[in-house]
């Protein structure tokens, strides 16, 4: 596949807000997926005083073929002070909207659900004005784990299907499944989460109709918010799948419009869109606080 199209190139910038965020995170020993997963929007988000925190360590028990996070066995270790430090970072940075995500932790009986709940509660305690979105793993489909997170009261519960049904065995770790992801999202609604959210990457070999099928499945699971972005290979390692194609801007726009017509409350669809892209704007749109439109 050829080099990145012009619309996927992001100018590297460094300014005072970036330095402030890095300094706070370093002193508190907390991590962000913004840098760990090489997100192209890190400059925009940090520049706006927004960050996506990664809890439960930096080692994932799964090896999805789109992700740059390190794979290994954390052997059950959990830093119980981590939720407090994340909340303290939120307080010091004065964040309005916080996304909390994590690696997969198949080595833990609850998949890390308790740590998510603790992080939500600590943020509520130390930064009561902040809105909290969680982007969770699939917890191996455990209803109890989803309930644990939901009971802590996140403003948005997110879990990504990542790709179309046909490509799931190729793209995601063998322990993940398309059906399990849909079940997690449906369960989140059933146990009281007001807003649910999911995301999909394009450029892995899917067809337009397959993406529409995913959108239909997500609506059947009562998902409110959807993000659609371009897959970019994180490294040239054999582990990471090559890009099958660079999806044109027009196709993103068309899929976004299809999603809105299906009844999603908020949609972001563009090459640079990632799970947490303009998360606060999507939240406000889902609540009817801003006009419904495809965010790009």
From Swiss-Prot:
<dbReference type="InterPro" id="IPR006638">
    <property type="entry name" value="Elp3/MiaA/NifB-like_rSAM"/>
</dbReference>
<dbReference type="GO" id="GO:0046872">
    <property type="term" value="F:metal ion binding"/>
</dbReference>
<feature type="binding site">
    <location>
        <position position="45"/>
    </location>
    <ligand>
        <name>[4Fe-4S] cluster 1</name>
    </ligand>
</feature>
<comment type="pathway">
    <text>Protein modification; protein lipoylation via endogenous pathway; protein N(6)-(lipoyl)lysine from octanoyl-[acyl-carrier-protein]: step 2/2.</text>
</comment>
<dbReference type="InterPro" id="IPR003698">
    <property type="entry name" value="Lipoyl_synth"/>
</dbReference>
<dbReference type="GO" id="GO:0005737">
    <property type="term" value="C:cytoplasm"/>
</dbReference>
<keyword id="KW-0479">Metal-binding</keyword>
<feature type="binding site">
    <location>
        <position position="39"/>
    </location>
    <ligand>
        <name>[4Fe-4S] cluster 1</name>
    </ligand>
</feature>
<dbReference type="InterPro" id="IPR007197">
    <property type="entry name" value="rSAM"/>
</dbReference>
<feature type="binding site">
    <location>
        <position position="60"/>
    </location>
    <ligand>
        <name>[4Fe-4S] cluster 2</name>
    </ligand>
</feature>
<keyword id="KW-0004">4Fe-4S</keyword>
<keyword id="KW-0411">Iron-sulfur</keyword>
<feature type="binding site">
    <location>
        <position position="34"/>
    </location>
    <ligand>
        <name>[4Fe-4S] cluster 1</name>
    </ligand>
</feature>
<dbReference type="GO" id="GO:0016992">
    <property type="term" value="F:lipoate synthase activity"/>
</dbReference>
<comment type="similarity">
    <text>Belongs to the radical SAM superfamily. Lipoyl synthase family.</text>
</comment>
<dbReference type="Pfam" id="PF04055">
    <property type="entry name" value="Radical_SAM"/>
</dbReference>
<keyword id="KW-0408">Iron</keyword>
<protein>
    <recommendedName>
        <fullName>Lipoyl synthase</fullName>
        <ecNumber>2.8.1.8</ecNumber>
    </recommendedName>
</protein>
<dbReference type="GO" id="GO:0051539">
    <property type="term" value="F:4 iron, 4 sulfur cluster binding"/>
</dbReference>
<keyword id="KW-0808">Transferase</keyword>
<feature type="binding site">
    <location>
        <position position="276"/>
    </location>
    <ligand>
        <name>[4Fe-4S] cluster 1</name>
    </ligand>
</feature>
<feature type="binding site">
    <location>
        <position position="64"/>
    </location>
    <ligand>
        <name>[4Fe-4S] cluster 2</name>
    </ligand>
</feature>
<feature type="domain" description="Radical SAM core">
    <location>
        <begin position="46"/>
        <end position="265"/>
    </location>
</feature>
<keyword id="KW-0963">Cytoplasm</keyword>
<dbReference type="InterPro" id="IPR013785">
    <property type="entry name" value="Aldolase_TIM"/>
</dbReference>
<keyword id="KW-0949">S-adenosyl-L-methionine</keyword>
<feature type="binding site">
    <location>
        <position position="67"/>
    </location>
    <ligand>
        <name>[4Fe-4S] cluster 2</name>
    </ligand>
</feature>
